[in-house]
Amino acid sequence: MVDWTDAERSAIVGLWGKISVDEIGPQALARLLIVSPWTQRHFSTFGNLSTPAAIMGNPAVAKHGKTVMHGLDRAVQNLDDIKNTYAALSVMHSEKLHVDPDNFRLLADCITVCVAAKLGPAVFNADTQEAFQKFLAVVVSALGRQYH
């Protein structure tokens, strides 16, 4: 279990309320696929991923990006039990999909970049970033749990 301070909880929940998951999700996943093209191998059923423009306009990428962000909403709602919240997803990504667990960290980085770009430094200040990155690190750890 993670020890969250009241300030961290407040920052995470407050920030989450300002995030448009249907906007950030597609942007973040598209950014991952563009910046880290080797991750595309896990999305072979998504159709055309040949160029940045194709990725940005790909409806399957957008849909899965939204799914990822809605999954993060579950973690925000279960801050005290993120590990168990993601137990089944960890098994699926490890045993069925064979996703390199480092890809979760790469996607978390892309989510952070997209949130920061959208909300700006007045909202996404250093304290908020610290709490949000801690939150994402806990999620990444929970998703990678099955790999250990």
UniProtKB/Swiss-Prot annotation:
GO terms for molecular function: haptoglobin binding; heme binding; metal ion binding; organic acid binding; oxygen binding; oxygen carrier activity; peroxidase activity. It comes from the Eukaryota. The keyword Transport applies. Heme b binds at H64, H93. PROSITE patterns: GLOBIN. Red blood cells. InterPro entries: Globin (IPR000971), Globin-like_sf (IPR009050), Globin/Proto (IPR012292), Hemoglobin_b (IPR002337), Hemoglobin_oxygen_transport (IPR050056). Keywords: Heme, Iron, Metal-binding, Oxygen transport, Transport. Residues 3-148 form the Globin domain. Gene3D superfamilies: Globins. GO terms for biological process: hydrogen peroxide catabolic process. One of its GO terms (cellular component) is blood microparticle. Belongs to the globin family. Heterotetramer of two alpha chains and two beta chains. Involved in oxygen transport from gills to the various peripheral tissues. This is Hemoglobin subunit beta. The gene is hbb.
